[in-house]
Structures are given as structure tokens and as C-alpha cells.
Amino acid sequence: MRLRVSACGGVFATDGQVVWDDYLDHRQFVLGPDSDAVLRWFIRWRDRDSVPERHRPVVEALLANDVLVAEGSQRDAQEQAVLHAWGRWGPVARAYHYSTRTTRGSRFSGVEAPRPVGTFRDAERIPLPGAEEARWLHRDLLDVLRVRGGGGGGGREFGDGGVSVLALGAMLQAAGGSVSSTELYPVVRDVDGLKPGVYHYDVQGHELALVGDFVGDADLIAACGDQAWVAGAGLVVFYTSLVWRHDSPRAYRVLQLDAGHVNQTLSLAGAALGLRTAFTAAIRDELVEELIGCDPATELAIGCAVIGGAVGGGVVGGE
């Protein structure tokens, strides 16, 4: 019988112990002092009895716990199927997916949602007009969906006109109107009635906090993965997610969906106002973190909405 180290697990250190994590079956196994030599030996297929006699009890223990896998076994077939399907995404992606995959015996728990933490109380604050003050070009949902689907409200080409502060207030109020783990950071470049700079949106007060200076074309393009088209926008809204809603790593999946819902609402509101909006997740996280001033340990950069006036139009969303 030939054995090798499982391809669907990994090693981490915790509380002074070295632990093998089997993410397919959600099991952890503490590795003893002789395990290292055995694992290194079976890094490729080798005969079960090819190790010295003193290591054979370790081999049996590792095999019983699926740290070692027997060639042709059910576990081997399962791993081969996973590797075939997930190989191009690399080991980290499949490890996360299967580690957070729930089973019929999974138990769920939640925590009470705290107040938003990113309120920047010491920053200059600017109250925003309510959504009712903006000039809405489309009020029927079907009309808005038609405009978005036909490219009129979405795209990567923008007109010379900027965005009005009335339109900005309306979009942010619509997008941030529910309890969410998503934070919004508008980078204002050409918004009529608002100083250029980096802001944070306070959903409770419906106001902006000025947290950074004007962002030039080069810095914005670099943060957005060298996509030159973003420089034509009057407004870029970066989305971040706070890890607080759940005590399970599965919450990372939910953070992405949450930001997507917020962006879709903002995009539909933008289309209803006659604006053009686009979304990109091709961002350089590190540059975005520096640009908006967030801590990557607690606040994760997700992507951004890029917003501007329609081609051939003036300032959009005002009276």
C-alpha cells in the first residue's frame, strides 16, 4: 500500500502545539514530535512500510486520521475530485471554502449588532440633503432596470458634468439605509457643492466626515488596479466590510454579498438620477487601505462604485 500526505489539509501552530487541520471533514489532529519526519517522507507516494520501525505507530495514527492518505482509497478519490475542480484557484481558496462549508450537524449562533464604529467624531462633518430633495429622472423600478440593462445607467465612459451633492445624498441614503457590515468611503473629485477629498459616510447621521485630502488621477488609478477609466468619474465610493456580525469564518462569504447588495442599491439609485455607475473589485487592497485610512486587521477592502454624469450631460441630480 502506498501513502502520501493529504492534499486537503494544512498545519498551523496554536497554544504551543502543532495541529493538522483537515478541512474536508472539519477535524483537527495534534501532531507529535515524530510526525515531521514522517510527513516529509510521505510528501510523495511511498510504500507504507518504507519507514523505520520506530515510526510505524506514527504512520498508523496519521493514516487513521486522514493526515496520510492511502492510494486508491475513498479519501484519495474524494481529494482527487476536489483538486480537479479547485486546482486553478490554489490551496487557500479551497481550504477556505471547505472549512466554512456547513454540514447537517452545524450549529449557528449570532451576536447583537453593535453601533457602527467608523464614525470619525473628530473629523469635519458635512450634513447631506435627503433623497427627497434630489431630481429623480426615473421613479418607476421597471424604467430604472431598463435604463441599467440598456447601458444608459451603467458603463465606463462619463460625461464632462459632475455629480450634484443632492444626488450624492440620495444615493448614499438609499444604499446605507439598512443595518449592514459595509462601510462607504466616497472619494469626491467633482461633486457640485462639496470639497474634493476622501470622506466616510455616517449612515446614522446621514452626513459625511472628511478623512482625507484630494486624490489625484495617478493615485486613484493605481488603487483601482491601473484602470485608467476611473479617472473620468466625479465620484468613487469604496466599500469596506467590518468583521463583527458573526463569530464564524463563514461570515467572510456574507461580507461579500452584503457589499454587493449595497452596491446594487446605490447603482439603481444612480440610474434613477440619470447618472452612470460601474463597479470594480480589481483594486489594490493595500493602496485603498492607505487612501481611506482603514486597518486591514478589522476592516476589509471589497471594491468600489465609480460614478459620473451621463455622456453629453451637465451636473446631474440637482434641481
PLM region descriptions:
Residues 274:
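Structured binding elements
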